[in-house]
């Protein structure tokens, strides 16, 4: 009875001879011959020692398989973990013990590290490993490694899948694309199952029920392993996060079934953490004060820029924590997650956040005048903004631009603009702070004479200042000219200058 491995020999051989003799005393040796067609012959032959010898008569075009280096490459690729010695032209081929088949209790850390170095042909030890065995729902053993370094992070090409599929220690598929999800392509190691046939094809793997069960069980255990490191050894996890955070974010977007588990692996900078520290979503929720119903976030190029955003003023006043999204991918991830622990993610720059301070700012007469300024600003800005309104959330800044309900952030819009130059930025909501000195000055000027040129100049520059802060100011020359005009006005009439 021959397997697919033997029959594949006819792909390179025009004829195959098998000479075999039993260990039993005075047994007869036999010669089996076939050209790989529909028949074969068996006849008596001479052989002094017991055992089996297979002779391949190669086709003319397959002479490369007579080269020792070619044969050595094949042996090392497919059979470097077989339990018996292999010799090539009298030389014993180096092989490694399949340590994944051994009990974990008998293996030391150095054994795992040495195996990883051999397996990956590297001098670097792994960051962590996961060794597990399962008999149900399907039998398999696995040994997975997380590297210390991400080659993608170094700017090299996209990492190819690094988990090899074995059956009884024989390589079935190197770098299988079907055993681990795409976002975990950085994971290295082996999966071995006796229930996987040696002749399984790529198409069969994709539709194999056993493979699917292995994949689900293995992924569950690996994500739990990573979460365990995050909980017990944050310093080690921070190194994993530094190298593979984009992979976890990719998974949180693409893997709906495991999205909840992947959300546990995410880390963020925050208004409640030091500059060099990161927090996870579970820690954020634990710190939420009574009355806070949503998880707030704000994006920006760096922490310093975010902390200067006027949108944070109301959150500081109420002592509500805000996640700082420093990676352009972060907002995309939270948009797909939508919620965590039944708490919805909410952009701190959203115009519909119900955090405004109650009551009025100033006396009724002044607020009426401020309302008249709002009407004036709407006329000046026209289609540049969606709305102008009195703010109940600002404490220190004169104004801010907010996103309409469910609208994308300006950071997301800038990415869209980079992808599509014809993309039109959405209209924002401008809120003005009636308690700020600049707004009070503009209210007074409007009450004095709505037609004052300086008032319009201030109004246009007010909006430009917000656009400049957010990096969306398009007409810088006009803005500079306005600033110069304001500076001249501040200097007094020309006849006072000597």
Regions found by a protein language model. Give the residues of each.
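Conserved GHKL (Bergerat-fold) ATPase module
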Residues: 1-7, 11, 15-498
